[in-house]
Regions:
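Acidic, metal-coordinating catalytic segment for phosphate/diphosphate chemistry
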Residues: 1-19, 92-93
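Short loop/turn segments immediately following the C-termini of beta-strands
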Residues: 30
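A conserved beta-turn-beta hairpin within the catalytic core of GNAT-like acetyltransferases
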Residues: 33-36
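A short gly/proline-enriched turn/hairpin at secondary-structure junctions
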Residues: 39-40
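Unchanged
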Residues: 46-140
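Charged phosphate-binding loop/patch that engages nucleotide di/tri-phosphates or the phosphate backbone
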Residues: 135-158
Length: 158
């Protein structure tokens, strides 16, 4: 018997807030979304992998960024669920959403070291934005995640 989509488990994931020297936030526009939505690097945690190692791995896989230092692990975990239109499509239908652990990191490299044309590219474009712009550029079902992340980051950097 097939599981109901609403009974699917949450995927264990990480998200990374990358700040440059001017405290601007790295965001990238996804290949698979035709609208002008941007997101911070994020992804799943592999079996046997801890959250921090997953964050470093995902960041490098998606952006080629290696020169970062951990500023702080954000408090708690933040969960989002996929809207009905994406249930059963994203992640090969295995999950209904993600439960994410977020990390704040400082990028110590140069912009020309960032490369989104990776082995398995996820992004079309990238840019640095002000922290307050985060909630203006994100897809609707992740808005509450970005609001929470933004508030935590602002407390740390201000």
């Amino acid at each position: 018997m097939k599981k109901k989509l609403s009974e699917l488990p949450l995927r264990s994931g990480v998200g990374i807030v990358v700040l440059n020297k001017q405290n601007k936030v790295f965001v990238a526009r996804r290949i698979d979304n035709p609208k002008n939505f941007w997101q911070m690097p994020q992804g799943g945690v592999d079996e046997g992998e801890n959250f921090l190692n997953a964050a470093y791995r995902e960041l490098e896989e998606e952006t080629s960024i290696k020169k970062v230092e951990l500023i702080q692990e954000l408090e708690g975990t933040i969960t989002y669920e996929l809207p009905d239109r994406l249930l059963g499509i994203i992640w090969k239908g295995k999950y209904r959403g993600q439960k994410q652990k977020w990390f704040l990191m400082r990028f110590n490299g140069e912009d020309n070291e960032i490369n989104i044309k990776t082995k398995n590219p996820e992004f079309l474009d990238w840019k640095w934005i002000e922290i307050d712009q985060l909630t203006e550029v994100v897809v609707d079902f992740k808005l509450h995640v970005y609001k929470e992340v933004k508030e935590q980051v602002k407390k740390i950097i201000n």
